[in-house]
Amino acid sequence: MFGIITVTGEDHTGIIAAVTTALAEQDVNIVDVSQTLMDKWFTMILRVEFNEKATPISTLQGYMDSVGKREGLVIRIQSEALFNAVNEI
């Protein structure tokens, strides 16, 4: 399954390391990534691939919520199909 992950929050050292390490621990492969800084605000969007039977998206969201809480970030995960449907014009 492909998913889209958004990460937002106040910039600080270690955000990318914390997020990507957590994803690797859940056997999630990063297919594409884009990140930017706007003043003190960090934003990252990742396209990822993972086995939803082995790691349901709800389980992955819960795991990433704990990372977000620890790092002061908002991390949201949704299926790529849902992301595309919602963002289609």
Residue ranges and their predicted role:
Residues 1-89:
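A conserved regulatory-domain signal marking ACT and ACT-like small-molecule sensing domains
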